[in-house]
Amino acid sequence: MLINFLLVGFGASLGAMLRYGISIFVKSKWKTDFPYATFFINITGSFLLGFLVSTALGPMWQLFLGTGFMGGYTTFSTFKVESMELKWKANFQVLFSYVGLTYLCGLIAAFIGIMLGV
């Protein structure tokens, strides 16, 4: 049982570090109201998680990669906070684009990941 917690924790720490690195890199390249870093992270995360859940990985790999790594990598809470910040700035065009594209592209990416993993 302890090994399961360690697998999830180690995977999450690696995923969070990758998310942080990507976020820093993207924000240094693109200065815009659209939150490209979080968008990229969540779309690639949707694809990767879709792929992982459709493969024949063992339960320990699912814990490490699916629950841990992908849980640390993707960020639903940042998506919501950035959405609220856009609302508070009354930047509705970017807000609706961000929310709509995140949900639409996330579903498509997860579907493609699942299809490729089967």
Swiss-Prot record:
Catalyzed reactions: fluoride(in) = fluoride(out)
UniProt keyword Lyase present: no
Domain of life: Bacteria
Main localisation: membrane
Keywords assigned by UniProt, alphabetized: Cell membrane, Ion channel, Ion transport, Membrane, Metal-binding, Sodium, Transmembrane, Transmembrane helix, Transport
GO BP terms in the entry: cellular detoxification of fluoride
Annotated compartments: Cell membrane
TM annotation in the entry: 5-25, 39-59, 61-81, 98-118
GO CC annotation: plasma membrane
Pfam families in the record: CRCB
Membrane topology: Multi-pass membrane protein
Regulation: Na(+) is not transported, but it plays an essential structural role and its presence is essential for fluoride channel function.
InterPro entries: FluC (IPR003691)
Alphabetized GO MF terms: fluoride channel activity; metal ion binding
Binding site for Na(+): 71, 74
UniProt signal peptide: none
Free-text function comment from the UniProt entry: Fluoride-specific ion channel. Important for reducing fluoride concentration in the cell, thus reducing its toxicity.
Record-linked NCBIfam families: crcB (TIGR00494), PRK14205.1 (NF010801), PRK14214.1 (NF010810), PRK14220.1 (NF010816)
Family assignment from sequence similarity: Belongs to the fluoride channel Fluc/FEX (TC 1.A.43) family.
Protein's recorded name: Fluoride-specific ion channel FluC 1
Organism: Listeria innocua serovar 6a (strain ATCC BAA-680 / CLIP 11262)
